[in-house]
């Protein structure tokens, strides 16, 4: 019998492979995206120091309304505003092994519109 592939395990494998080649520095930190069934989370991370510089998610009080894609747009806007407030303008986008489509793309576009370059 053919077993059905576990999509999340495949995504995690893809993410590990990409993370081997992608790293954030203090000059150009990594914008990491995690997508769950109910929410979306974004962090700006300096991998050299191992520190999260800015973050936003659907758990924030400002984000609770709208569809998941609309929430992703608000999260992208919030994380960009918080990063720009800390003097970060350029980041490396880490899509977390997800396809660049839907909620991930909406978050990335909103972050670009609000001052992050990647």
From Swiss-Prot:
Provide the coiled-coil residue spans.
none
GO CC, sorted alphabetically, is: cytosolic large ribosomal subunit
Stored InterPro entries: Ribosomal_uL18_bac-type, Ribosomal_uL18_bac/euk
User: GO:BP terms for this protein?
Assistant: translation
Please give the Gene3D superfamilies that the UniProt record associates with this protein. 3.30.420.100
One GO molecular function term?
A: 5S rRNA binding
Pfam families recorded: Ribosomal_L18p
Q: Which cysteines are joined by disulfide bonds?
A: none
Q: Matching PANTHER family, A to Z?
A: 39S RIBOSOMAL PROTEIN L18, MITOCHONDRIAL, LARGE RIBOSOMAL SUBUNIT PROTEIN UL18M
Q: How does it assemble?
A: Part of the 50S ribosomal subunit; part of the 5S rRNA/L5/L18/L25 subcomplex. Contacts the 5S and 23S rRNAs.
| Record-linked HAMAP family | Ribosomal_uL18_B
Q: Which protein family is named in the record? A: Belongs to the universal ribosomal protein uL18 family.
Q: What is the designated name of this protein?
A: Large ribosomal subunit protein uL18
Q: Which organism is it from?
A: Streptococcus pyogenes serotype M1
Q: Which gene encodes it?
A: rplR
């Amino acid at each position: 019998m053919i077993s059905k592939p576990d999509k999340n395990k495949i995504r995690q494998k893809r993410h590990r492979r990409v993370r081997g080649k992608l790293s954030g520095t203090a000059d150009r930190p990594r914008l990491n995206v995690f997508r769950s069934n109910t929410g979306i989370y974004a962090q700006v991370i300096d991998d050299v120091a191992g520190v999260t510089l800015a973050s936003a998610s659907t758990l924030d009080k400002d984000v609770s309304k709208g569809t998941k894609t609309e929430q992703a747009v608000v999260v992208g806007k919030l994380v960009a505003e918080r990063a720009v407030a800390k003097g970060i303008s350029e980041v490396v986008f880490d899509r977390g092994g997800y396809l660049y489509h839907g909620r991930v793309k909406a978050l990335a576009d909103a972050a670009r519109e609000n001052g992050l370059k990647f």
